[in-house]
Amino acid sequence: MADLNKLAEDIVGLTLLEAQELKTILKDKYGIEPAAGGAVMMAGPAAGAAAPAEEEKTEFDVGLTDAGANKINVIKEVRAITGLGLKEAKDLVEAGGKVKEAVAKADAEAMKKKLEEAGAKVELK
């Protein structure tokens, strides 16, 4: 039981960058996908019927591909969007990756516009 408590403390103590690396490891090595609510779920077998290709996507992930030359302004925008602390926002900007996940289309486009105005290169997935 002490090992589980230690593991829980270690997970809670992860920085945003470390949590992102853990998510990647769990996905790549073990096939565990993160659920929308932040919980972890196992990847199940493929469904028999595929979703229609014409369905419009309503939720997007806002991804930072390049911080550009004006990194300070990008860090400020990332902090404003995510509510992260200065160090966490700086680490995220330097490493790149998802700024926000499962965001409504209008909000995702607004975030993209703000980050691009700050000098970053952003993609919506």
From Swiss-Prot:
Organism per entry: Cereibacter sphaeroides (Rhodobacter sphaeroides)
One GO cellular component, as annotated: cytosolic large ribosomal subunit
Record function comment: Forms part of the ribosomal stalk which helps the ribosome interact with GTP-bound translation factors. Is thus essential for accurate translation.
Subunit field text: Homodimer. Part of the ribosomal stalk of the 50S ribosomal subunit. Forms a multimeric L10(L12)X complex, where L10 forms an elongated spine to which 2 to 4 L12 dimers bind in a sequential fashion. Binds GTP-bound translation factors.
Protein name (Swiss-Prot/TrEMBL): Large ribosomal subunit protein bL12
Keyword rRNA-binding: no
Pfam families, per the entry: Ribosomal_L12, Ribosomal_L12_N
Family matches, as PANTHER family: 39S RIBOSOMAL PROTEIN L12, LARGE RIBOSOMAL SUBUNIT PROTEIN BL12M
CDD domains reported in the protein's UniProt record: Ribosomal_L7_L12
Listed GO MF terms: mRNA binding; structural constituent of ribosome
Ribonucleoprotein recorded as keyword: yes
Family per record: Belongs to the bacterial ribosomal protein bL12 family.
Keyword tags: Ribonucleoprotein, Ribosomal protein
